[in-house]
């Protein structure tokens, strides 16, 4: 079994990865590589490899952005309507704020986890380290308005609180959902 990347035991200016001293080099990350079903991550990872780059960062799908957020064109973190992939399965209930049905925070989306595992495996084949972001602050109200953890977007009624309180312990049910996701 491969070991995770770690600080080099003899020189903390380097990492140790695959039993070799490693410097992580990147110029970009596609935060939406997994959560955006339209994004071709295989081509992206092959492009990183061919350019001698070996690091990417991607988000879990708990946080996403709307098209045009931060004035970014073709933002991979802003999937098209109905295209967000995240850890939780879609329900049969219409009404997700960016198209499609609401999420069920008690059921996992097997397609999402298959895509995540394939992304990480492909990154490994391409020699790319993945920094996986489980949670991200909701910088603006519209971003919280897109989250599956927002009560408006799930059938469980969980997450009825202001965006600034999402990662506090204020909502025990939401905290339980977050803990379950981390364990998964």
Locate predicted features.
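Active-site mouth of glycoside hydrolases
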Residues: 10-12, 18-184
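Short acidic, Pro/Gly- and aromatic-enriched capping/linker segments at domain boundaries
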Residues: 1-14
